[in-house]
């Protein structure tokens, strides 16, 4: 009888260890150095400002001087100069990514642009490894669909937020990039709400024909 009782437990543990990475297709180009170099060229395209409209996103985030803002999945650090200016000398900017070769480029950008209020954090697929209770606003720009383990990542993003802090998701509509985007906007909202957040505001169009949803912890 004891052996029979234990079988469901072993089955559950096996299922958990084999839990699928939900963003494997979106992350295909990130698995090799050559692939990441190709992505980096896109991220650092000198014409990107015209399509991404970073200043529009910054304005919609309602960043105040002195805040601490985290750029989750910063990549090569494209948004860091814009965020650095927005928070000012008394503020802080955390640039987080899970790829060290991307972060090498972000570090160079911080040095070249003299972003004295910017810091780099190397995270993992499940944890940005930011200090607990340290961040006023977390920006997830074109990155949520890359989260392989969204539940775990959201739990750790929540842990890093200050009381009253906000999580800002900016991403593409699935209908526009069906081969790359995992969820429709409404399903993204449901997934994040299911992990202890509530919606505080939404915009149908910002940046590069993207949506923006701002969340606070429940």
Feature-to-residue mapping (PLM):
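A short SAM/SAH-binding and catalytic strip from SAM-dependent methyltransferases
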Residues: 136-150
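Core SAM-dependent methyltransferase catalytic element
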Residues: 189, 201-218
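A short acidic, Gly/Pro-enriched loop at the edge of an enzyme's catalytic core
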Residues: 128-138
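Class I SAM-dependent methyltransferase SAM/SAH-binding core
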Residues: 70-128
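Conserved class I S-adenosyl-L-methionine
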Residues: 166-190
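Class I SAM-dependent transferase core
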Residues: 21-70
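A short glycine-rich, Lys/Arg-flanked "PGG" loop and its adjoining helix->strand segment in the class I
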Residues: 84, 151-166
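Short glycine-dipeptide loop
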Residues: 65-66, 89-90, 161-167
């Amino acid at each position: 009888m004891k052996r029979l009782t234990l079988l469901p437990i072993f089955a559950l543990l096996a299922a958990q260890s084999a839990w699928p990475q939900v963003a494997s297709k979106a992350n295909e180009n990130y698995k090799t150095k050559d692939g990441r170099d190709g992505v980096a060229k896109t991220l650092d395209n000198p014409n990107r400002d015209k399509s991404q409209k970073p200043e529009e996103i910054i304005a919609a985030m309602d960043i105040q001087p002195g805040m601490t803002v985290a750029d989750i999945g910063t990549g090569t650090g494209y948004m860091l100069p814009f965020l650095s200016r927005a928070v000012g000398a008394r503020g802080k900017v955390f640039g987080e990514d899970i790829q060290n070769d991307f972060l090498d480029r972000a570090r160079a950008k911080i040095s070249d642009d003299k972003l004295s209020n910017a810091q780099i954090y190397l995270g993992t697929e499940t944890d940005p490894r930011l200090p607990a209770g340290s961040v006023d606003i977390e920006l997830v720009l074109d990155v949520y669909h890359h989260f392989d383990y969204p539940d775990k990542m959201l739990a750790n993003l929540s842990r890093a937020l200050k009381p009253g802090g906000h999580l800002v998701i900016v991403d593409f509509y699935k209908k526009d990039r069906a081969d790359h985007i995992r969820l429709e906007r409404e399903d993204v909202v449901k997934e994040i709400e299911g992990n202890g957040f509530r919606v505080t505001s939404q915009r149908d169009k910002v940046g590069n024909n993207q949506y923006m949803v701002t969340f606070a912890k429940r």
